């Protein structure tokens, strides 16, 4: 079932595509952009992108209004998301990024809640089983990309709730 995305009112407002000079207005505008990016990526389960892809995406390019957020402004929005812990640059040139509509700690908490709820403590899973197995089909983390999953499991490992291990066909995790 494909869900349609409901664009916020600002997306239909041409000045939204120009970062405003007034500090207070700009902060509100950046907060709106951050919220939009996270909602859009969450709905589309999009976890990584390049800045060039972002610039051409409907996210930053409103074809109906014929308005596009300039690449310099996109970089500012992305940097704001990084400061909040929702984005990680994948290269030094800052041309590609991992977008996390939930921070790794939040994903870890969701995964661990499922483990506890389903009585899976002291069990070992492959990464594939966790995100693509039948047992997790109804969970929000089902289909989660491996990069984000690993960050979530690393957060759980720091809390001594899990250990990332090597299994015969790749990586796995043991929950405590």
Curated annotation (Swiss-Prot):
One of its GO terms (cellular component) is cytosol. Its main location: cytoplasm. GO terms for molecular function: protein homodimerization activity; structural molecule activity. Expressed at the mRNA level in kidney, liver, pancreas, and placenta. Lower levels of expression are found in heart, skeletal muscle, brain and lung. Changing residue 124 to E: Abolishes binding to CHMP6. Component of a complex at least composed of ELL, SNF8/EAP30, VPS25/EAP20 and VPS36/EAP45. Component of the endosomal sorting complex required for transport II (ESCRT-II), composed of SNF8, VPS36 and 2 copies of VPS25. Interacts with CFTR; the interaction requires misfolded CFTR. Interacts (via C-terminal half) with the ESCRT-III subunit CHMP6 (via N-terminal half). PANTHER family: VACUOLAR PROTEIN SORTING-ASSOCIATED PROTEIN VPS25 (PTHR13149), VACUOLAR PROTEIN-SORTING-ASSOCIATED PROTEIN 25 (PTHR13149:SF0). Belongs to the VPS25 family. This is Vacuolar protein-sorting-associated protein 25.
């Amino acid at each position: 079932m494909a869900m349609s995305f409901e664009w916020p009112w600002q997306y239909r407002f041409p000045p939204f595509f120009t970062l405003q000079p007034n500090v207070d207005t700009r902060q509100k505008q950046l907060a709106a952009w951050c919220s939009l990016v996270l909602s859009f990526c969450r709905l589309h389960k999009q976890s990584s992108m390049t800045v060039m892809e972002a610039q051409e995406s409907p996210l930053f390019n409103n074809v109906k209004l014929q308005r596009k957020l300039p690449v310099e402004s996109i970089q500012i929005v992305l940097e704001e998301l990084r400061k909040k812990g929702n984005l990680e640059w994948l290269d030094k040139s800052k041309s590609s990024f991992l977008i996390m509509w939930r921070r790794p700690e939040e994903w870890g908490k969701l995964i661990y809640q499922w483990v506890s709820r389903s009585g899976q403590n002291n069990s070992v899973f492959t990464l594939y089983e966790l995100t693509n197995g039948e047992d997790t089909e109804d969970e929000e983390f089902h289909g989660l990309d491996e990069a984000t999953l690993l960050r979530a499991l690393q957060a759980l490992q720091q809390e001594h709730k899990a250990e990332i291990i090597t299994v015969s066909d790749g990586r796995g995790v043991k929950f405590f």
